[in-house]
Design a protein with these regions (language model features):
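Membrane-embedded alpha-helical bundles of polytopic integral membrane proteins
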Residues: 1-207
Length: 207
């Protein structure tokens, strides 16, 4: 596409090429993790959770009173969650964050003695853990599934998930540019359209 349009620079084409290149970079990183097996995959997604949570907290206003809650989130809950995934303790890693951490973090937040926007601040840390750690940790947790006749090949489930998700992202962009008319959430994502979303989901489902 770039070769055919070399005489006519296009921001849309440049964006698409950038997305595809990012796709290959991510595919390469996941591939390297696969070489190291279970340890590599769990370690990779633990790092992804760490960077995602760090970015989330950076974009979320916090106060000095949140120090102990954030300390627990980064240095206790996150590594504990992935440690449980490593050991395959399903009953614990499915409850650690949505139950135990949700109860303990508000208590830790009170130690700082700061009551300003207390509930809002606590909720942000809680849901940061849910999105960035709990949800992401369930990708390597696929390694713990025991599927009859599929023993030793659980890495393929993660590979399939990554391929479908990345393909959906690229295809949503393509469909959005080809047939996009109605924006989903203009203030949140100016380029996401209803048509692109539907086209991307349906196309990825065919995979």
């Amino acid at each position: 596409l770039r070769w055919r349009a070399r005489a006519q620079p296009s921001a849309v084409l440049d964006n698409l090429v950038a997305r595809i290149r990012a796709w290959w970079v991510m595919a390469g990183v996941v591939g390297i993790a696969f070489v190291f097996g279970r340890a590599g995959v769990i370690g990779l997604f633990a790092l992804v959770s760490l960077f995602a949570l760090r970015e989330f907290i950076t974009l979320t206003p916090t106060r000095r009173g949140d120090y102990y809650a954030l300390l627990a989130a980064f240095y206790i809950v996150l590594p504990w969650q992935y440690g449980l995934v490593w050991t395959g303790w399903y009953g614990m890693y499915t409850l650690l964050i949505p139950v135990h951490a949700f109860l303990v973090l508000p208590i830790l937040a009170t130690i700082g003695g700061d009551t300003t926007r207390y509930l809002e601040r606590t909720a942000k840390v809680q849901w940061g853990l849910m999105i960035c750690v709990f949800c992401i940790s369930h990708v390597p947790a696929l390694l713990n599934l025991e599927i009859p006749g599929y023993a030793g090949r659980n890495l393929l489930l993660i590979a399939f998930l990554v391929i479908v998700v990345q393909s959906s992202d690229v295809l949503q962009y393509v469909w959005g540019k080809l047939a996009g008319r109605h924006l989903i959430a203009p203030k949140l994502s100016p380029s996401k359209t209803v048509e692109g979303f539907i086209g991307g989901v349906l196309s990825a489902s065919l995979l």
